[in-house]
């Protein structure tokens, strides 16, 4: 159908070495978002696609990336998929009873510390939803997810529905049996992925 698939090797990942990872964590986390936006703009500039024909996707912490990018540049794409997304950064990182919170201080910072808390608040997807137009968005979550609890993406969608000023689709799909990794059965996993691709392709106008 003429789809080009691109992977963005952005800071915060270790694709280009240890320093590349360090330059996208803690008080440098925003570099991750800047790099992703730069990658998308590069694809358009070099005519691999156009903003109104671009789909973006991120999983877990990558869902945070997509949520932050949508707040910063809602014009960046036609449709976005956030899978089991970590989008309520402040509330999650303030709750030390959650299984990953304390160990994740090394990645994101401790919001109880003033400087780190202010920085994290500046990019937290949930806290920065604006009263503006957003592209079509699909959010997927799982009822038994122990890493990103299902209420987090659910409240994100609820707030987005209340705030956004467009009429583009905003879909929330919860797998009632799965955990953080999604459906585990061979065919169920394929059906889940097919649904997600179908939504993205439909919004790009090449669904059928």
Language-model segments: what does each one mean?
Residues 1, 7-208:
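Active-site-proximal cap/loop segments of hydrolase catalytic domains
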């Amino acid at each position: 159908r003429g789809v080009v698939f691109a992977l963005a090797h952005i800071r915060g990942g270790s694709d280009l070495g240890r320093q590349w990872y360090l330059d996208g964590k803690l008080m440098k986390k925003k570099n991750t978002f800047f790099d992703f936006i730069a990658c998308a703009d590069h694809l358009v500039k070099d005519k691999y696609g156009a903003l109104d024909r671009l789909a973006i996707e991120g999983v877990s912490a990558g869902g945070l990336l997509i949520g932050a990018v949508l707040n910063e540049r809602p014009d960046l794409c036609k449709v976005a998929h956030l899978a089991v997304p970590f989008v309520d950064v402040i509330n999650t990182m303030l709750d030390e009873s959650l299984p990953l919170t304390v160990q994740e201080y090394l990645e994101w910072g401790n919001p109880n510390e003033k400087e780190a808390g202010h920085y994290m608040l500046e990019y937290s997807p949930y806290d920065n939803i604006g009263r503006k137009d957003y592209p079509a968005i699909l959010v997927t979550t799982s009822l038994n997810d122990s890493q990103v609890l299902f209420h987090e993406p659910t409240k994100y969608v609820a707030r987005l529905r209340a705030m956004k000023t467009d009429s583009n689709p905003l879909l929330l799909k919860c797998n009632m049996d799965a955990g953080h990794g999604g459906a585990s059965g061979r065919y169920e996993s394929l059906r889940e992925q097919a649904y997600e691709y179908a939504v993205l392709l439909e919004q790009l106008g090449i669904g059928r």
